Amino acid sequence: MKIVIAPDSFKESLTAQQVAEAIKRGFQQSIADVECLLCPVGDGGEGTVDAIRHSLDLEEKCLQVTGSFGQKEVMRYFQKEQLALFEVADLVGLGKIPLEKRNPLQIQTRGIGELIRHLISQEIKEIYIGVGGTASNDGGIGIAAGLGYQFYDEDGNALPACGQSLLNLASVSTENRYKIPEDVHIRILADVVSPLCGHQGATYTFGKQKGLDSTMFEVVDQAIQDFYEKVSPATLKLKGAGAGGGIAGGLCAFAQASIVSGIDTCLDLIDFDKKVSDVDLVIVGEGRLDRQSLAGKAPIGVAKRTPVGVPVVAICGSLVEDLPSLPFENIQAAFSILEKSEPLEDSLKNASLYLEHTASNIGHLLNMPKI
């Protein structure tokens, strides 16, 4: 039996690669002749680039850039020939910012623009960027600063490139703007369709989880709106521009990037269609499968790309009651790995073992003679 194992990461617990390896161990315990092909995936959220680089055998490199609070910091990126990938969260991810410092209006993303300039100087032509899991809410002003834009208040004083400055912004200088070469293509791997502004936009949707007080939502949202009406009104209409606290919008406006489906692009890059062409079973998974998963998340994206006739089974941390009845979206069965009632911290810690147990049990089911 040949099985493709294509899970997303389990947030705050296991990477997609670790999830896939645990599931493989489970199947090896219960199916004697099993052949497991590991295809860790991501849909644009945090961990997507790590999932892709395992399949593409990319070389890890580092560059010193401006960090989240103006200090110098080393940032990872992954390269193969003229292709490069990186995640914004490697610089300004929630997990990298201590709780006491989580003010999304003070966190800087200038280093992302600096990294883009470096990659282009190294003759990179294809750049893929994951923007999920960020702690910033700067509307993309940091990206612009890293690409040479300068910002001033009404008295002509230079402003730092952070979200707070949007509240005092009076003018923008493009005198030192870095122009992206026409033969360079920058693509944003997105798993959300949130616009830049409004009640479905970056601030209202993600501000709270990043530490922004709800009393600031309206004024920050309006400041981002005013900024883009000055520099790039068209960006306000882009679906997905709100991803990464507006970083996606900044990349589109200032780096001529395009927003693409995170999961579909991931599957294209790892040549998923070829890998799944002759398999007996596909396993998908993520930490929590719910109705929101139906809108572009990894398990559904993988299931839709699986050939008709190949069964798809989901192995997840938890299954939420709002899911439609099975089968749905080409998924024939779904299993939660939870084995007992216990604190969340323990479930996260034991996830690898629970994944093994669940996969092993599914393997035993597959071994049963047809009834």
Curated annotation (Swiss-Prot):
It comes from the Bacteria. The keyword Transferase applies. GO terms for molecular function: ATP binding; glycerate kinase activity. Belongs to the glycerate kinase type-1 family. Pfam families: Gly_kinase. GO terms for biological process: organic acid phosphorylation. Its EC number is 2.7.1.31. The keyword ATP-binding applies. Disulfide bonds: none annotated. This is Glycerate kinase. Keywords: ATP-binding, Kinase, Nucleotide-binding, Transferase. PANTHER family: GLYCERATE KINASE. It catalyses: (R)-glycerate + ATP = (2R)-3-phosphoglycerate + ADP + H(+). The lineage of its organism: Bacteria, Pseudomonadati, Pseudomonadota, Betaproteobacteria, Neisseriales. It comes from Neisseria meningitidis serogroup A / serotype 4A (strain DSM 15465 / Z2491). InterPro entries: Glyc_kinase_flavodox-like_fold (IPR018193), Glycerate_kinase (IPR004381), Glycerate_kinase_RE-like (IPR018197), Glycerate_kinase_sf (IPR036129).
